[in-house]
Amino acid sequence: MNAYIPRRLALIGTVTASALFGVACTAAESSAPPAATPDVGEKPAEETASPAGSAPVRRPYTISFGGDVHFEGVLRTRLNADPKTALGPIAKVLSRSDLAMVNLETAITTGGTPAPGKQFTFRAPATALTALKAAGVDVASMANNHGMDYMEGGLADSLAAIRRSRLPVVGVGRNEAQAYRPWRTTVNGNRVAVIGATQVLDAEFIQAWTAAGDKGGLASAKNEARLLQEVRRARRNSDTVIVHLHWGTELQKCPNEAQRSLAPKLIQAGADVVVGGHAHILLGSGYLKNGYVSYGMGNFVFYNWGPETGRTGVLTLTIKGREVLKDQWTPAVIQGGVPVPLAGTARRQAVAGWRALRGCTGLSATPG
């Protein structure tokens, strides 16, 4: 339970991370939605009978997403001063939802060896996980191009810190199975599966950083077949399947060809929500058939807060089973490394600007 709202009491049932981890808003406008089509040969999750033979009782739940998080520069100072307040005022927004997720773009280590030749390498102490939990984050993804910045030693430290913290982290593992395995939880009667993977890796590190067989590392979306297999598997016994991706081109306002190619494949395989980031700026969000896609969440807790890269916010989805009932955007601006929610006219203008980003995505304001 976090320091802001005891919403964890609404989170029922098993909270099962991969074996690696053990047990583990306010906003603007909204769009209305639909029911998604199940994979051929499978029952929709909503039709799965309960053990007693009666229909399961599901109520809508909310999940909030923030963008890229690290703890370098001024953020390390905040973290060292007090992990429980390190994310600043945005914690209240995250804590209002039943679930909250961010992209943890750093290795969790104080040791390791920096990736050779890499211009930017990020690492943070284990208190970074404390900070996320205190801010209301329920699950994070480390599948990104900084998750193994401190190579194998940093990976081992990261996995150990995750186990101790009991904060579920997807997209990373001590072997391939754990890296691709979803985090599972049940909220308001909905069985939720969250998978993390990265489509962005420096060419010279793809082999070393990708989890394969018994080798630890990150879940890579470059192995599309493997990722789609995991989505299909999750679809069979989940009411909502969420895929969190690191993808896109830095500072490019529209989704690139690789994103536009992968998103429909994930929806077809059974994903209900696909959310990602990497570009350091916001990209458009909306419906792709009956699924929901957000192509870019931008920076979130980040030391770079220029005019474009400092625009951020929290995306909150209201979901029941496979239906995304509503999307809401709580805009913020990064000040001193942390997101500060906007109010009044600035908020309304920021929401309108966020909606306008959909223009070059091929996504829709409504499902279907």
Residue spans of the language-model regions?
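Acidic, metal/ion-coordinating pockets
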Residues: 3-5, 25-26, 33-368
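Intrinsic disorder/low-structure terminal segments
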Residues: 17-20, 29-30, 39
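Sec-dependent bacterial lipoprotein signal peptides
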Residues: 1-23
